[in-house]
């Protein structure tokens, strides 16, 4: 029930601006992006996705363990290739990309806490799986936003982790006894229903940082909650990446692996990206009509999140009807959340009567 709150997001989250310092602006659609929803009529009248795509119209994800340097490398890649950078989707992704953009109370954001997970990963209130379920839905929403941006503008995107790598945390949680087998089954069912609807990244970049070095970086970072992460949990994340994620992704997209010191040279990474052939994976089989159906899906965020809620009773993510109704009504009272985007006068929307 708690996950149903994610479906409160508006049906369309418009793409944000270009990456700062883009070097290849001549290759990118840079006009003001129309906020009218794309549809069948637009496709018939000539809004063809293939006309917008070029050699840098790619989806690139940067993966790695905690504190592996994903953010820094992803930003550098996006800047040098003129792509849009998407920082890692967190608990507040849906709230910060919709409404007035302000983070919401935990009650409206999955009723979960990353800090609590670090402090007490075996908490008997179900926080660990509630967190993982919410983060998967947040990554799903972000991946849809990224695809919508690419297919609408032709500008490539760089993400930190994605729906394809999210499972590494689930496996680590289960191996460490943080969640039950029923939670794993529930997660895998949602993944089975949602993942096939999307196209995988064109390229995955994995930063391989040994667990001892990861722990050293965590200690240096100084987050009192994150510092409680065990080496066993970090090792399970690494194992899931290397034994499952990378082999599977290598079948459908390009994979580049770098040691921590190699990842410190983004120019070399960008050179490697430009030499990739991109000669495998489902992107090669797409045409304007398959792109049309994908665009119709990713712009409809309610549909994107539809199968993140399935009729299965799981105590970790289930709340009562009265509590759910109270939370829903409270959510609608928040600024910019009562009506669809553009129709909320309290957040400055104008000319509502003409829309």
From Swiss-Prot:
- Which cofactor is essential here? FAD
One GO cellular component assignment for this chain's record is:
mitochondrion
- Transit peptide location on this chain: 1-35
Q: How is it modified after translation?
A: Phosphorylation at Ser-250 by PINK1 is required for the binding and/or reduction of the complex I substrate ubiquinone.
| Outcome reported for the amino acid change (mutating residue 250 to D) | Phosphomimetic mutant; able to rescue mitochondrial depolarization in a Pink1 mutant background
Superkingdom, according to UniProt? Eukaryota
Protein keywords: Acetylation, Electron transport, FAD, Flavoprotein, Mitochondrion, Phosphoprotein, Respiratory chain, Transit peptide, Transport
Q: Which CDD domains match?
A: NDUO42
For this chain, one GO molecular function annotation is: NADH dehydrogenase (ubiquinone) activity
Tell me the cofactor note: Binds 1 FAD per subunit.
| Any single biological process term in GO | mitochondrial electron transport, NADH to ubiquinone
Residues bearing Phosphoserine are 250
PTM sites of type N6-succinyllysine:
122, 285
Where does it live in the cell? Mitochondrion matrix
N6-acetyllysine is carried by which residues? 122
Q: Which Pfam families does the UniProt record give?
A: dNK
Q: What does this protein do?
A: Accessory subunit of the mitochondrial membrane respiratory chain NADH dehydrogenase (Complex I), that is believed not to be involved in catalysis. Complex I functions in the transfer of electrons from NADH to the respiratory chain. The immediate electron acceptor for the enzyme is believed to be ubiquinone.
Looking up PANTHER family in the UniProt record yields:
DEOXYNUCLEOSIDE KINASE, NADH DEHYDROGENASE [UBIQUINONE] 1 ALPHA SUBCOMPLEX SUBUNIT 10, MITOCHONDRIAL
Q: Which family does it belong to?
A: Belongs to the complex I NDUFA10 subunit family.
Subunit details:
Complex I is composed of 45 different subunits. This a component of the hydrophobic protein fraction.
| Protein name, UniProt field | NADH dehydrogenase [ubiquinone] 1 alpha subcomplex subunit 10, mitochondrial
Q: Which gene encodes it?
A: Ndufa10
